[in-house]
């Protein structure tokens, strides 16, 4: 037992079976005492091939080779040698037998005595995951004397000074202290430590699991400080009773991940990157540095962090070759010295001197101690000591699991590496399902370069099965594609490799993997991780046995079953009585798994059956034919019986169906012959649908009608507002209501109100300057606006009320329509009932027999309806004939009242076609009558069409009757035939007719008779029809006459209604025309009234001006006389140039202006007026201000919204037609003169020193330069101020006051000035001075009447040179009676200082003098008729 186990465990010097343990101690003692040669010992040790290979021959007692004793605790527990319990004893006594006894390695735990299990309880940790051969190779490098670079000094865990927002500063400080105390110098906290800390919170496991998943953001199984702080924070949340979030808030997640990245980047990267690991050995110089020192086997230290250092005392040996101990075969033999075994540090690296040399291997297999990692397989290496023992494979943990016990190539029967499979446990731990695996994974440590065979070992299969069961939680037996992607993706391989692996593992393309296929996939992944390429085709060793055997088994079973079916002659056999067990003839199933012909062969199962089929004899074939014939006969007999039963059932069902049909026919006949049957179809679905469509049409018209009503309401509101404006303007002529707004729709805007207020202020100012009271206004400024707003509010309120009423009507109409629609729907049928009705009445979706029956019922119903209609018509005809016979004298009355009952009878008893035809006939009659009334020729064949229609209807009715009777006869014959067929038996012949005959002819069916009496009934009906035909024709003629009379009466009523409608329309049009005429007359009347008012005002002004002129003449005569006396006295005195003009200028210009201004109002509008200025003169100031912006509201064309159209019409209606000559010469500033700011700018411009410039520029189109005056006030402030005065009601009064005050300073010329000034006033714009341009205009128009005065003397020096400096001042034109102009002589005396000017001309003159304007001499042209006035010479 020991030999075989040690063979697979790799022990080379294991004891021979049966040898006592104490017999080995002398050799251990002799070897320990320093013997260097191997004496011929017992033969049991001779054939022990150890793991050193060639070294065995020269090393002598080479049993003390390094023994790999670090086996897992579960398998090789007693393999720890030289550890506490044995080490002190060996150190004290040297080479004592107990020491060697404690080194029995490689034995199974159950095969050793209890005393050898003491060293296993030394407390050393057991390594769970073996290292790769590359790691072992790197660990050998320090044996050669080259010390590895010292690792960087571990610094304390540095936590960045970053403040976490989700915890307080105090909590963060506490957590930092706790974290540092837990992790020490590390940067992360292990999962176990974190678990220990988290469990102190006493929270449930589910909450702690959630906390771990949320905290471990890196999914590394370790916690950085921010993750640890987050875990503490979540624990605090749960302890305080709050729920854990399903996912971390984005802010917290970002903070934690950022801080983790900072900590990760702070880790110093001082260690050199390891070289790329390959299967190539490292043949560097350090390999040969320590050749003299024999290898020092180390005692096993599994899972010690210094395990790599324990192995560094061995010489650097590249692994990967097929040698169990990792030594090269080419290495030179070691010298046979016992000193090589002295420094055996079997548990403490770097301290070999503390342990005594322990000769191991006498009782145990020589195994390298201190090394428990997996090693490549070691081929048997015999040492020459003997060949009676089988070669031993040593040095592997998985050597126990890699024992081939079956045929090579099968799963689990493979020469697996004796040292096991590296990193298979790490791969298992990586792929196991665990919480938090969703976040990521790391494939670090999974790759290697171990030798992996094609086949799957048992241990590997067990690991893969455990993985499969762990992931297959529901025990489905397979793993889906999504789960497999998650598992295989954690291996870290490329997607392309995983796709190829999946294709190989899932050959049937089922999208899922069972346990064996999953093992194949994992094995391919494991091979790929160890550097093997993924094969393009799955090798035979990896084909799952279940799949391979299943396919073969299925093919075998199919062939066997097919051949067995061919061999079995059980065609006519019905039971097991004829069965005979014949082993020779039986095909016989032989399992290929239990009985194998050879190594790989299996029994050809189909061979026997094929041979037996070929060996059938003729008798056997005949027997089979006979049996098959018997079976066929039996089947035929069974089919016949079944057919008979089915026929019986069909006949019974048919009889029941016929009975039901007969009952249905009787019920239908009863319904058709019922007196109220005509009212049955009045409320049909078609009529309901028609009514619903009509209702929808009417409902669609409601919005259109409502919109029309709203439009009419809107027009009414606009007309009412316009009418109110007209009435208000009529009642308050001087109010602001006469203003027509310039806003949209004629509304008065704020600008219009501002203009109106400005005009009112100018009117009041003019009245104040004129010394007259302000003209009384009917209302204040805002009264008209308030009245308009009140009326507008009233109209709007009424419109809103009407709108509310309209909406209420709309809503009520909609509600009524909905109620009607609901009533129509309620009366109708539901979808299910409608489906049933259409199925059983319209024969939709039923069988052919049922459909024919339904059509038969419909035809019989129509036939009965036709019969009833004929009878009803006959009865109606008889009643009409009797009524006409009883009352022959009441023809007229009967003709008037007969249409109504006739129509009702026809509508009640006639068919739908008849009613349609009658309606069409009546419509044709009405059309013909209307055509005749319109003078068109109606159709001549109207009477013929009626007769033809009657004949056609008669023939159709006869045809329908005949067809109905034929159908009745056919149905009766068919029924009789069916009854005869069903009564096949002689016993039922007498009973069945008696029971079946009465239903076809129930007593209620009056129209039906048997087949024998149908002919007589038909003849009787034909005779009755002939007799009734004449009566019916007579009734039809009478009915037609009555209908014609009724149609004529209706047409007459319609014509009367049309005439009444036309009369009403004409009356309405007349009322509308009268209303329009009334509105127009009102406008004209208002215009006439306004014109009369203006004429009266003009006459009053003329009278006032005339009186003022007369008074002025008297004063002027006295003043002139006084002036002449003064002139005579100072004749010898020379007047200065400056005084003369100062004294003379008021005499010439001011009286001229004062005399002209009164004449503006008294004179009739002369030729050449501009439309707007004349309007300003005639109309009120409020109207004149807005005449250029908007039309007045009193024009006849008030309906037009065009302001220009109103303006023209208003001007035409109020102003006499002027001559067109002066109009083109109007200045361009006229269109802009209504702006008060423009006038202000003109005033500012005129107040400048060059005040004469605006005057000539303004008069350039109308005035000649030679008539201009250097110091004239044409462009000064006098223009604008006089304009304001003119626009006021008392504007003329101010000028009258000026003429009264200064009238004596000039010759009295009222008439000439009055006659000639008005055109100038009217030819200028409203805002420009009406009086200023007048003198140049008059001078231009009448140059011949007034000769220019002589030039002044050379003494004066004009200040402002101008081309017209020598021209006289602009004198007004004089009448023919004016005296000749006095010659220029002595300048007149200065005017009295107390005489102020009447207008703004005086201020303008003073301003011009102050500005430095020089005055020239002027002469006064005296054209007055006063004889007492003398001439003033310049």
From Swiss-Prot:
Domain spans labelled EF-hand: 203-238, 493-528
Pfam families to which the protein is assigned, alphabetical: DUF1720 (PF08226), EH (PF12763), WH2 (PF02205)
Example GO molecular function: calcium ion binding
Assigned keywords, A-Z: Actin-binding, Cell membrane, Coiled coil, Cytoplasm, Cytoskeleton, Endocytosis, Endosome, Membrane, Repeat
Pro residues bias spans: 294-303, 1215-1225, 1345-1395
Topological relation to the membrane, as annotated: Peripheral membrane protein
Composition bias, Low complexity: 28-49, 349-359, 1173-1193
Gene Ontology BP term (one): endosomal transport
Biased composition (Basic and acidic residues): 783-814, 911-929, 949-981, 1016-1063, 1085-1105, 1112-1124, 1257-1266
Coiled-coil boundaries: 607-815, 941-1137
GO cellular component: actin cortical patch; endosome membrane; plasma membrane
Organism superkingdom: Eukaryota
Alphabetized InterPro entries for the sequence: DUF1720, EF-hand-dom_pair, EF_hand_dom, EH_dom, WH2_dom
Residues of the EH domain: 171-259, 460-549
Subcellular location: Cell membrane; Endosome membrane; Cytoplasm, Cytoskeleton, Actin patch
Main subcellular location of this protein, as a coarse class: membrane
Compositional bias segments (type: Acidic residues): 1129-1140, 1267-1287
Region annotation Disordered: where it falls in the sequence: 1-133, 271-380, 587-615, 768-814, 862-1063, 1078-1434
Function noted in UniProt: Component of the PAN1 actin cytoskeleton-regulatory complex required for the internalization of endosomes during actin-coupled endocytosis. The complex links the site of endocytosis to the cell membrane-associated actin cytoskeleton. Mediates uptake of external molecules and vacuolar degradation of plasma membrane proteins. Plays a role in the proper organization of the cell membrane-associated actin cytoskeleton and promotes its destabilization.
Protein name from the UniProt record: Actin cytoskeleton-regulatory complex protein pan1
Record gene name: pan1
């Amino acid at each position: 037992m020991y030999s075989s186990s040690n063979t697979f465990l790799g022990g080379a010097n294991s004891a021979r079976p049966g040898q006592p343990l104490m017999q080995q101690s002398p050799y251990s003692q002799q070897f320990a005492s320093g013997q260097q040669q191997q004496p011929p010992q017992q033969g049991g040790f001779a054939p022990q091939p150890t793991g050193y290979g060639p070294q065995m021959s020269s090393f002598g007692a080479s049993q003390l080779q390094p023994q790999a004793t670090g086996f897992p605790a579960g398998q090789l527990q007693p393999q720890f040698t030289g550890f506490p319990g044995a080490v002190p004893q060996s150190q004290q006594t040297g080479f004592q037998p107990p020491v060697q006894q404690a080194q029995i390695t490689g034995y199974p735990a159950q095969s050793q005595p209890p005393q050898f299990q003491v060293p296993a309880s030394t407390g050393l940790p057991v390594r769970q995951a073996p290292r790769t051969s590359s790691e072992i190779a790197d660990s050998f490098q320090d044996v050669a004397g080259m010390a590895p670079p010292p690792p960087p000094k571990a610094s304390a865990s540095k936590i960045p000074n970053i403040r976490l927002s989700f915890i307080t500063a105090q909590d963060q400080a506490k957590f930092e202290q706790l974290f540092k105390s837990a992790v020490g110098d590390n940067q992360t906290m292990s999962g176990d430590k974190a678990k220990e800390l988290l469990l102190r919170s006493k929270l449930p496991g589910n909450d702690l699991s959630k906390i771990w998943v949320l905290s471990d953001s890196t999914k590394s199984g370790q916690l950085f400080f921010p993750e640890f702080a987050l875990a503490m924070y979540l624990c605090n949340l749960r302890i305080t009773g709050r729920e854990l979030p399903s996912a971390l808030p984005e802010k917290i997640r970002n903070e934690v991940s950022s801080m983790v990245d900072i900590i990760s980047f702070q880790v110093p990267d001082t260690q050199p990157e390891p070289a790329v690991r390959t299967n190539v050995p490292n043949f560097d110089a350090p390999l040969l540095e320590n050749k003299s020192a024999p290898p020092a086997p180390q005692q096993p230290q599994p899972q010690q962090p210094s395990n790599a250092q324990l192995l560094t005392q061995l010489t650097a040996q590249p692994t990967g070759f097929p040698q169990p101990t990792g030594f090269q075969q080419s290495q030179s033999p070691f010298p046979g010295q016992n000193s090589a075994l002295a420094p055996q540090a079997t548990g403490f690296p770097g301290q070999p001197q503390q342990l005594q040399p322990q000769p191991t291997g006498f009782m145990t297999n020589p195994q390298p101690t201190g090394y428990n990692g997996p090693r490549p397989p070691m081929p048997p290496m015999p040492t020459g000591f003997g060949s009676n023992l089988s070669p031993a494979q040593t040095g592997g943990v998985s050597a126990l699991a890699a024992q081939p016990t079956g045929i090579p190539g099968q799963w689990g029967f493979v020469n697996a590496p004796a040292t096991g499979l590296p990193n298979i446990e790490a791969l298992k731990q990586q792929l196991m399902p665990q919480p938090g695996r969703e976040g990521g994974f790391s494939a670090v440590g999974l790759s290697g370069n171990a030798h992996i065979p094609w086949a799957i070992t048992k241990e590997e299969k067990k690991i893969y099965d455990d993985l499969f069961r762990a992931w297959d939680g529901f025990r489905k037996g397979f793993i889906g594609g999504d789960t497999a992607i998650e598992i295989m993706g954690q291996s870290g391989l490329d997607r392309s490799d995983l796709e190829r692996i999946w294709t190989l593992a899932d050959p049937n393309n089922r999208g899922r993997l069972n346990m064996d296929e999953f093992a194949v996939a994992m094995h391919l992944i494991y091979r790929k991780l160890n550097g093997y390429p993924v094969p393009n085709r799955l090798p035979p060793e990896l084909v799952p046995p279940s799949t391979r055997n299943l396919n073969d088994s299925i093919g075998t079973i199919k062939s066997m079953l097919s051949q067995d079916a061919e061999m079995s002659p059980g065609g006519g056999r019905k039971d097991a009585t004829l069965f005979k067990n014949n082993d020779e003839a039986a095909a016989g199933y032989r399992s290929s798994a239990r009985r194998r012909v050879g190594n790989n062969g299996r029994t050809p199962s189909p061979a026997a059956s094929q041979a037996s089929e070929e060996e059938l004899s003729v008798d056997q074939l005949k027997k089979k034919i006979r049996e098959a014939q018997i079976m066929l006969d039996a089947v035929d007999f069974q089919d016949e019986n079944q057919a008979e039963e089915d026929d019986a059932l069909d006949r019974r069902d048919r009889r029941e169906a016929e009975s039901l049909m007969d009952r249905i026919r009787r019920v239908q006949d009863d319904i058709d012959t019922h007196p109220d049957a005509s009212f049955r179809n009045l409320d049909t679905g078609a009529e309901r649908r028609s009514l619903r469509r009509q209702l929808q049409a009417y409902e669609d018209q409601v919005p259109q009608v409502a919109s029309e009503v709203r439009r009419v309401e809107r027009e009414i509101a606009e007309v009412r507002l316009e009418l109110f404006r007209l009435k208000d303007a009529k009642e308050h002529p001087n109010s602001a209501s006469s203003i027509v707004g310039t806003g949209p729709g004629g509304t008065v805007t704020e600008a219009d109100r501002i203009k109106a207020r400005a005009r009112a202020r100018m009117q009041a100012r003019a009245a104040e300057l004129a010394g007259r009271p302000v003209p009384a206004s009917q209302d204040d400024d805002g009264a008209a606006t308030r009245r308009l707003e009140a009326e507008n509010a009233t109209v709007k309120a009424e419109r809103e009320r009407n709108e509310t009423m309209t909406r209420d009507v709309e809503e009520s109409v909609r509600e009524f329509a909905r109620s009607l629609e609901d009533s129509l729907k309620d009366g109708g049928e539901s979808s299910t009932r409608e489906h049933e009705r259409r199925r059983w009445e319209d024969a939709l979706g039923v069988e052919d027999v049922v459909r024919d029956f339904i059509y038969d019922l419909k035809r019989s119903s129509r036939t009965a309806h036709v019969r009833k209609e004929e009878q009803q018509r006959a009865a109606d005809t008889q009643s009409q004939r009797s009524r006409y016979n009883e009352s022959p004298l009441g023809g007229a009355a009967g003709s008037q009242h007969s249409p109504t009952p006739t129509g009702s009878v026809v509508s009640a008893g006639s068919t739908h076609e008849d009613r349609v035809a009658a309606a069409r006939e009546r419509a044709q009659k009405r059309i013909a009558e209307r055509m005749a009334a319109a003078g068109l020729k109606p159709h001549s064949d109207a009477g013929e069409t009626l007769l033809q229609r009657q004949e056609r209807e008669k023939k159709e009715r006869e045809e329908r009757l005949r067809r109905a009777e034929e159908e009745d006869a056919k149905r009766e014959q068919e029924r009789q035939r069916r009854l005869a067929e069903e009564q096949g038996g002689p016993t039922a012949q007498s009973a069945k007719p008696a029971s079946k005959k009465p239903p076809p002819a129930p007593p209620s069916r009056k129209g039906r008779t048997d087949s024998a009496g149908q002919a007589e009934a038909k003849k009787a009906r034909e005779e009755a029809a002939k007799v009734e035909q004449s009566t019916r024709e007579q009734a039809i003629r009478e009915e037609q006459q009555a209908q014609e009379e009724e149609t004529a009466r209706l047409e007459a009523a319609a014509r009367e209604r049309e005439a009444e409608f036309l009369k009403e329309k004409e009356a309405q049009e007349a009322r509308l025309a009268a209303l329009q005429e009334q509105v127009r007359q009102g406008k004209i009347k208002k215009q006439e009234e306004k014109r009369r008012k203006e004429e009266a005002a003009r006459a009053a002004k003329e009278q006032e001006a005339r009186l003022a002129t007369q008074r002025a003449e008297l004063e002027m005569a006295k003043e002139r006389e006084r002036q002449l006396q003064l002139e005579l006295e100072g004749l010898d005195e020379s007047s200065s140039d400056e005084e003369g003009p100062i004294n003379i200028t008021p005499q010439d210009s001011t009286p001229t202006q004062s005399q002209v201004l009164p004449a503006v109002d008294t004179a009739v509008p002369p030729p050449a007026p501009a439309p707007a200025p004349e309007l300003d003169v005639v109309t009120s100031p409020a109207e004149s201000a807005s005449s250029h912006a908007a039309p007045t509201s009193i024009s006849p064309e008030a309906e037009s919204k065009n302001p220009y159209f109103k303006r023209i019409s208003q001007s035409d209606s109020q102003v006499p037609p002027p001559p067109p000559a002066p109009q083109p010469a109007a200045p361009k500033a006229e269109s802009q003169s209504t702006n008060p700011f423009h006038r202000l700018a003109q005033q500012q411009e005129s107040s400048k020193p060059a005040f004469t410039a605006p005057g000539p520029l303004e008069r350039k189109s109308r005035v000649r330069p030679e008539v201009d005056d250097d110091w004239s006030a044409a462009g000064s402030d006098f223009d604008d101020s006089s304009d304001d005065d003119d626009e006021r009601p008392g504007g003329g009064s101010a000028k009258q006051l000026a003429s009264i005050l200064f009238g004596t300073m000039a010759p009295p010329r009222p008439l000439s000035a009055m006659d000639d000034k008005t055109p100038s006033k009217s030819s200028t714009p409203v805002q420009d001075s009406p009086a200023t341009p007048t003198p140049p205009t008059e001078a231009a128009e009448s140059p011949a009447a007034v000769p220019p005065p002589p030039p002044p003397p050379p003494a004066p020096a004009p200040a402002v040179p101008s081309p017209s400096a020598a021209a006289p001042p602009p004198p007004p034109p004089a009448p023919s009676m004016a005296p000749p102009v006095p010659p220029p002589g002595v300048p007149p005396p200065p005017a009295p200082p107390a005489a102020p000017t009447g207008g703004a001309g005086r201020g303008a003159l003073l301003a011009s003098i102050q500005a430095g304007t020089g005055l020239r001499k002027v002469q006064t042209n005296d054209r007055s008729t006063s004889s007492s006035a003398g001439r003033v010479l310049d």
